[in-house]
Curated annotation (Swiss-Prot):
Record's function text: Regulatory photoreceptor which exists in two forms that are reversibly interconvertible by light: the Pr form that absorbs maximally in the red region of the spectrum and the Pfr form that absorbs maximally in the far-red region. Photoconversion of Pr to Pfr induces an array of morphogenic responses, whereas reconversion of Pfr to Pr cancels the induction of those responses. Pfr controls the expression of a number of nuclear genes including those encoding the small subunit of ribulose-bisphosphate carboxylase, chlorophyll A/B binding protein, protochlorophyllide reductase, rRNA, etc.
Region (Disordered): 1-23
InterPro entries, per database record: GAF, GAF-like_dom_sf, HATPase_C_sf, His_kinase_dom, HisK_dim/P_dom, PAS, PAS-like_dom_sf, PAS_2
Keyword Transmembrane helix: no
Key words, A-Z: Chromophore, Photoreceptor protein, Receptor, Repeat, Sensory transduction, Transcription, Transcription regulation
Domain (PAS) ranges: 620-690, 750-834
Protein name stated in the entry: Phytochrome A
Any one GO BP annotation for this protein: detection of visible light
Keyword Transcription regulation: yes
Native species: Zea mays (Maize)
Name of the gene: PHYA1
PANTHER family attached to this UniProt entry: OS08G0260000 PROTEIN, PHYTOCHROME 1
Quaternary structure and interacting proteins, as annotated: Homodimer.
GO molecular function: phosphorelay sensor kinase activity; photoreceptor activity; protein homodimerization activity
SUPFAM superfamilies for the chain: ATPase domain of HSP90 chaperone/DNA topoisomerase II/histidine kinase, GAF domain-like, PYP-like sensor domain (PAS domain)
């Protein structure tokens, strides 16, 4: 379903992309119209009225392509810069000036009395060679940028003017046909000359990054509050906000911190037009935007007249803001601002990349929001601090992505749970009324303010819903206008063209519809968005009048309310998918209930599914066991209580503890005391489903290995799960790092020439690379060449972060921008002097093969203790370990597929069962005789038994007595139980010529008792089935029973029920009988598992099962405890 139009079969992600593109195009046109009106109107510009007028204008009348092009050209090529720096545009071939700002000659060539002997100062103009303006090495470094594909890696370049000796940060970016260089003065007192270099900027953000990384997941609010607090402390601005874009492109101040006395904007919503699409595009290109003084006069750019097109300033921080934005800032007393873009992965759920997919094919990016800083006086932030803020925003974006993933998992789980509950309610009553009148109901499926059901020409309403006549009118409109669609969703009935939208008022704006049949419809309703908006900490009464011509956040809030007064929150794709799923279930239920269902083939489907699933799982399990035993890496496993149940030969060899000695011991007794808390935490988290990676702990050694010291392992904890995705144990897949640590310790102790160690071809020397304090690659050993395919001379003296490792245009490609950010954090932590933990790391080698490894980073210091760079050690898991991890992943995927298959089968079976129920209910009203009614009752009982079995699919371990299998307490007749159970084996008896004889006392069998008759029927049918299966052809099965009444009070009696099933022949094989008594036997057969479940049910009834084997005869003796019905007590 798609917004404001009929449903289609396209995927959620494609619908999102289509609607997003449409919104962007529409807003860009509106932005251009507003800009043109502002330029023409001057002081008479009325922002509020124009937003409302443009919203009501038909799309075909909005804007003209000429206006849009002119607007975009004006934004990107405005030929004006801010005066806190100057700008040069250089021809890439000649290195000569082709454009410069009017203030550049004064800033770059003015002679200073502090610099003697400047006889002929250079002049700056069109055609000037830029080398004549600066001293070496700055001029050389600037020229070196010409050969870089991504020149931003070199920023900032520290240059010094020849005439004045003044230092500048040269910030380089590439535009069409030229290099554009921003020059910003350096204040040596605040940032000494040695501060140039991207890695130094990362150090400024180290504290803030650590704070963000230490946050527990699960709270977007806490994450946003933390980042605004850290930016506030880092930059010193008066106000810092986290500004979030919603799906319809409007914005909201999601988090905020201010200095005392400043009015907060927290909770304020802005129209989408407040931040034009052109500005958002520029934020995607240049992720930090600074305005130092909105009252300062802009500086013009002088260009070579031979240029065919104006210089693009998209990448320039100096680019002058639009006059409209400057007026907006001044009106809200925000004289200076700093804005960082928060760029996250596009939400394309159907296009999830594979783990080893090249980075060029990774997800697209989108602008989630902005981190906005305001100051009430002019403020300049030097480039190193701005770069630190940009990096902090990238780290924040990585965590926003993680929160999205977590929210998605929780959301899908909740929707699946609600769909299951609603499906069960539908199945029980075979009518959609149950999901309206019951609890939960359809309002619990998606967020809404009201809902309704039109079914059988009757209307049922829930909470805030239109009247019955209005719902019928909406249904008529749907049939007339959207008759061919299966549903509809819109955030505005008015915009969707419903003629009666005005009569519904503001409380009914958005609607989602699912048609069950042409006349039966489900509705969900939402109120207008303004009802969801709260002003947090407002001191200004929103009802007070503002000057509509004065652009201000308060006025934007008013404009937003005007825009959305007829709109609700939009219906998201996952909500529409949930509605569509319920729609399909309802259709299947009602369609199957309208005709007799065909039950043939049902048993075969279930049987095939079980057999296929068991065979596949057994094959994978066997492979896992074989791999674990023969792997050349240490692998150990524990059960839910921490007792060792897996200990392969490799870990036995390293520790000196044999397999038979380790099995059954608690894992905490086998690790060194210093590692007990680590392993305890790791085990606890893994049993909760949270798997820790790359944790280092030490294992005790025994026997001949005792004197060798502990075994140092780096371990991944892998939760072992059953078919129902429940954690039943933990597997530890490890790497022996003992030798690796010895090499590293030896390396770090060497004070002299370390090259002999780095470049030693000994296979024990791991791959090593390094960088100096400025980020240039300084080391690349032979093992690294073998691992990556890149030779030392191809990478040394290149930027480690950017040219050697990057998500694009690098020697070793990383699979995503997030991975690059994580690598930057690890390197930065080491440079800042922090003890860095081992981190998972991956890259594509020269042959585009993906390499997964562990990375440890150590800082390199000189004799004075000053950090001069970093050394990075790589440890690559063996092929056996990687294969074991892949097999484990395959096992988990297989279990997940089986779980989904069982879930599908349960829902698929419900529909034909509903049809069977309908057929029997119809037969009851056709005047059946007593025998025919008895057969119908047998069918009902079998139906209810199957319902119980399907519900058991949710149980974790149904063979365990402590499982949550439920027992009902209801009145039933024992004869009905036995007859229904016998009916389930009669076809098998006829095929083998087996006679079934029931020697049951009639009075006892017709007695009414209390208990779970359906579960008892299930038990009896299971034991009858195996008795018939293992009886010889032409044999017999005899059934007898005995009831013993025990009084436990004046009016309360318990009945000890005993049922014997005797059959001829060799009987049930001994191995199946033994499986019946084993609760956790991985080798259980289908019959053994079924009997184990039945025995568990009997034990829940305070009974049990015994088996007697005599000459040529076998007997099952079933016992259970029941309660006597009052009528039975009176007899």
């Amino acid at each position: 379903m798609s917004s404001s139009r009929p449903a289609h079969s396209s995927s959620s992600s494609s619908r999102t992309r289509q609607s997003s593109r449409a919104r962007i195009l529409a807003q860009t046109t509106l932005d251009a119209e507003l800009n043109a009106e502002y330029e023409e109107s001057g002081d008479s510009f009325d922002y509020s009225k124009l937003v409302e007028a443009q919203r009501s204008t038909p799309p075909e009348q909005q804007g003209r392509s000429g206006k849009v092009i002119a607007y975009l050209q004006h934004i990107q090529r405005g030929k004006l810069i801010q005066p806190f720096g100057c700008l040069l545009a250089l021809d890439e071939k000649s290195f000569r000036v082709i454009a410069f700002s009017e203030n550049a000659p004064e800033m770059l060539t003015t002679v200073s009395h502090a610099v003697p002997n400047v006889d002929d100062p250079p002049k700056l103009g069109i055609g000037t060679n830029v080398r004549s303006l600066f001293t070496d090495p700055g001029a050389t470094a600037l020229q070196k940028a010409l050969g870089f594909a991504d020149v931003s890696l070199l920023n900032p370049i520290l240059v010094q003017c020849k005439t004045s000796g003044k230092p500048f940060y040269a910030i380089v970016h590439r535009a069409t046909g030229c290099l554009v260089v921003d020059f910003e003065p350096v204040k040596p007192t605040e940032f000494p000359a040695t501060a140039a270099g991207a890695l130094q900027s990362y150090k400024l953000a180290a504290k803030a990054i650590s704070k963000i990384q230490s946050l527990p997941g699960g709270s977007m609010e806490a994450l946003c509050n933390t980042v605004v607090k850290e930016v506030f402390d880092l930059t010193g601005y008066d106000r810092v906000m986290a500004y979030k874009f919603h799906e319809d492109e409007h914005g909201e101040v999601f988090a905020e911190i201010t200095k005392p006395g400043i009015e907060p904007y927290i909770g304020l919503h802005y129209p989408a037009t407040d931040i034009p699409q052109a500005a958002r595009f520029l934020f995607m290109k240049n992720k930090v935007r600074m305005i130092c003084d909105c009252r300062a006069r802009s500086v013009k750019i002088i260009e070579d007249e031979a240029l065919s097109i104006d210089i693009s300033l998209c990448g320039s921080t100096l680019r002058a803001p639009h006059s409209c934005h400057l007026k907006y800032m001044e009106n809200m007393n925000s004289i200076a601002s700093l804005v960082m873009a928060v760029v996250v992965n596009e939400n394309e759920e159907d296009d999830e990349p594979e783990p080893e997919q090249p980075p060029q094919q990774q997800k697209k990016k989108r602008l989630w929001g902005l981190i906005v800083c305001h100051h009430e006086s002019p403020r300049y932030v030097p480039f190193p601090l701005r770069y630190a803020c940009e990096f902090l925003a990238q780290v924040f974006a990585v965590h926003v992505n993680k929160e999205f993933e977590l929210e998605k998992q929780i959301r899908e789980k909740n929707i699946l749970r609600m769909q299951t509950m609603l499906s069960d309610m539908l199945f029980k009553e075979s009518s959609p009324l149950s999901i309206v009148s019951g609890s939960p109901n359809i309002m619990d499926l998606v967020k809404c303010d009201g809902a309704a059901l039109l079914y059988g020409d009757k209307v049922w309403r829930l909470q805030t819903a239109p009247t019955e006549s209005q719902i019928r009118d909406i249904a008529f409109w749907l049939s007339e206008v959207h008759g061919d669609s299966t549903g509809l969703s819109t955030d505005s009935l008015q915009d969707a063209g419903y003629p009666g939208a005005a009569s519904l008022g503001d409380m009914i704006c958005g609607m989602a519809v699912a048609k069950i049949t042409s006349k039966d419809i489900l509705f969900w309703f939402r109120s207008h968005t303004a009802a969801e908006i709260k002003w947090g900490g407002a001191k200004h009464d929103p009802s007070d009048k503002d000057d509509n011509r004065r652009m201000h956040p308060r006025l934007s809030f008013k404009a937003f309310l005007e825009v959305v007064k007829t709109k609700s929150l939009p219906w998201s794709d996952y909500e529409m998918d949930a509605i569509h799923s319920l729609q399909l279930i309802l259709r299947g239920t009602l369609n199957d209930a309208s005709k007799p269902a065909q039950a043939s083939g049902l048993d075969n489907q279930i049987g095939d599914l079980k057999l296929d699933g068991l065979a596949e799982l057994q094959a994978v399990t066997s492979e896992m066991v074989r791999l674990m035993e023969t792997a050349t890496v240490p692998i150990l496993a524990v059960d839910g209580n921490g007792l060792v149940n897996g200990w392969n030969q490799k870990v036995a060899e390293l520790s000196g503890l044999r397999v038979d000695e380790a099995i059954g011991r608690h894992i905490l007794t086998l690790v060194e005391d210093s590692s007990v808390s680590l392993v305890q935490r790791m085990l606890y988290l893994a049993l909760q489903g949270r798997e820790e990676k790359e944790v280092r702990f030490e294992l005790k050694t025994h026997g001949s290995k005792r004197d060798d010291g502990p075994v140092i392992l780096v371990v991944n904890a892998c939760a072992s799960r059953d078919l129902h995705d429940h954690v039943v144990g933990v597997c530890f897949v490890a790497q022996d790092m003992t030798v690796h640590k010895l090499v590293m310790d030896k390396f770090t102790r060497v004070e002299g020439d370390y090259k002999a160690i780095i470049h030693n071809p000994n296979p024990l020397i791991p791959p090593i690379f390094g960088a100096d304090q400025f980020g240039w690659c300084s080391e690349w050993n032979a093992a690294m060449t073998k691992l990556t395919g890149w030779h030392r001379d191809e990478v040394v003296d290149k930027m480690l972060l950017g040219e050697v490792f990057n998500s694009s245009n690098a020697s070793c490609l990383l699979k995503s921008k997030d991975a690059f950010v994580r690598l930057c954090i690890v390197i930065n932590s080491a440079l800042a002097g922090e003890e860095a933990e081992k981190a998972s790391f991956g890259f594509f080698d020269r042959n585009e093969k993906y390499v997964e490894c562990l990375l440890s980073v150590n800082r390199k210091v000189n004799a004075d203790g000053v950090v001069t760079g970093v050394f990075c050690f790589i440890h690559v898991p063996s092929d056996d370990l990687q294969h074991a991890l892949h097999v484990q992943q395959a096992s988990e995927q297989t279990a997940q597929r089986k779980l989904k298959a069982f879930s599908y089968m349960r829902h698929a079976i419900n529909k034909p069962l509903s049809g069977m129920l309908y057929s029997r209910e119809t037969l009851k009203s056709t005047g059946l005789n007593e025998e025919q009614m008895r057969q119908v009752r047998v069918g009902d009982n079998c139906h209810r038994q199957l319902n119980k079995i399907l519900a058991d699919l949710d149980q974790d371990n149904i063979t365990d007595k402590s499982s949550c299998l439920d027992l009902d307490m209801a009145e039933f007749v024992l004869q009905d139980v036995v007859v229904s159970a016998v009916s389930q084996v009669l076809i098998g008896c006829q095929a083998k010529g087996i006679r079934v004889a029931c020697n049951l006392p009639e009075r006892s069998m017709k007695q009414k008792v209390y208990g779970d008759g359906i579960r008892l029927q299930q038990i009896v049918s299971d034991f009858l089935f195996v008795s018939v299966k293992f009886s010889p052809a032409g044999g017999s099965v005899d059934i007898s029973s005995k009831l013993t009444k025990n009084s436990i009070g004046e009016n309360l009696h318990l009945i000890d029920f005993e049922l014997r099933i005797k059959h001829r022949g060799a009987g049930v094989p001994a191995e199946i009988l033994s499986q019946m008594y084993e609760e956790d036997n991985k080798e259980q057969s289908e019959e053994g598992f079924s009997l184990a479940v039945s025995r568990n049910l009997l034990r829940l009834m305070n009974g049990d099962i015994r088996h007697l084997r005599e000459a040529g005869m076998s007997t099952f003796i079933l016992t259970a405890e029941l309660a006597a019905a009052p009528s039975a007590v009176g007899r």
